[in-house]
Amino acid sequence: MSEERIPLIGERFPEMEVITTQGRIKLPDDYKGRWFVLFSHPGDFTPVCTTEFYSFAKKYEEFKKLNTELIGLSVDSNISHIEWIMWIEKNLKVEIPFPIIADPMGNVAKRLGMIHAQSSTATVRAVFVVDDKGVVRLILYYPMEIGRNIDEILRAIRALQLVDKAGVVTPANWPNNELIGDKVINPAPRTIKDAKMRLGQPFDWWFTYKEVKTT
């Protein structure tokens, strides 16, 4: 993979050493065996970003149950991050238990494609989900004006981990799909023999589903 190209889904997350509010971190190696969500925000001490950090903090234990860590990032300084965290903890009564990367020169943000035309001096709301092998599994970009749906990020991680475990694919709005509820879809058959074995199953040989345990 080119050193300058933005990492894509299915590729290894690029190796880098970053400075955070919890010290230096080597990505992705320091999270080997764990998933992590790296998310960028436009700036400290801004209303939408504050609501996002509050929500991430409130949902932190749900991420932990999925063997997943959180890492924030913006082009603010480490001092700014620390002051903002202290303000959140004092005024909103919630602890920020995860590190925030300080990237004042924007090197990490540029490497990960977090600087868009909307602003050349701040990051958009990007999300990278990286699995326990250091592979990028999901990339999301939100404009600055729209706060992220933290429950959707959790849903996507649950779906990805189920896909890995059970060898299935998940339908729209899983686990609340309008057609099959919390069931999952079997991958497409690879041979004519496999296709014929599925004849008569709902909905058809190319679209079959089943129940799986999610725990």
UniProtKB/Swiss-Prot annotation:
Group of enzyme by EC: oxidoreductase
Entry keyword RNA-binding: no
Main location: cytoplasm
GO MF: peroxidase activity; thioredoxin-dependent peroxiredoxin activity
The protein's Enzyme Commission number: 1.11.1.24
Catalyzed reaction equations: a hydroperoxide + [thioredoxin]-dithiol = an alcohol + [thioredoxin]-disulfide + H2O
Annotated Thioredoxin domain residues: 7-162
Location of this chain's protein in the cell: Cytoplasm
The organism's place on the tree of life at top rank: Archaea
Pfam families according to UniProt: 1-cysPrx_C, AhpC-TSA
UniProt-annotated binding residues for substrate: R125
Biological process annotations from GO: cell redox homeostasis
PROSITE patterns xref list: THIOREDOXIN_2 (PS51352)
Note: The active site is a conserved redox-active cysteine residue, the peroxidatic cysteine (C(P)), which makes the nucleophilic attack on the peroxide substrate. The peroxide oxidizes the C(P)-SH to cysteine sulfenic acid (C(P)-SOH), which then reacts with another cysteine residue, the resolving cysteine (C(R)), to form a disulfide bridge. The disulfide is subsequently reduced by an appropriate electron donor to complete the catalytic cycle. In this 1-Cys peroxiredoxin, no C(R) is present and C(P) instead forms a disulfide with a cysteine from another protein or with a small thiol molecule.
Family: Belongs to the peroxiredoxin family. Prx6 subfamily.
UniProt-listed PANTHER family: ALKYL HYDROPEROXIDE REDUCTASE C, THIOREDOXIN PEROXIDASE
Subunit structure: Homodecamer. Pentamer of dimers that assemble into a ring structure.
Function, in words: Thiol-specific peroxidase that catalyzes the reduction of hydrogen peroxide and organic hydroperoxides to water and alcohols, respectively. Plays a role in cell protection against oxidative stress by detoxifying peroxides.
Name by which UniProt lists this protein: Peroxiredoxin
Organism: Saccharolobus solfataricus (strain ATCC 35092 / DSM 1617 / JCM 11322 / P2)
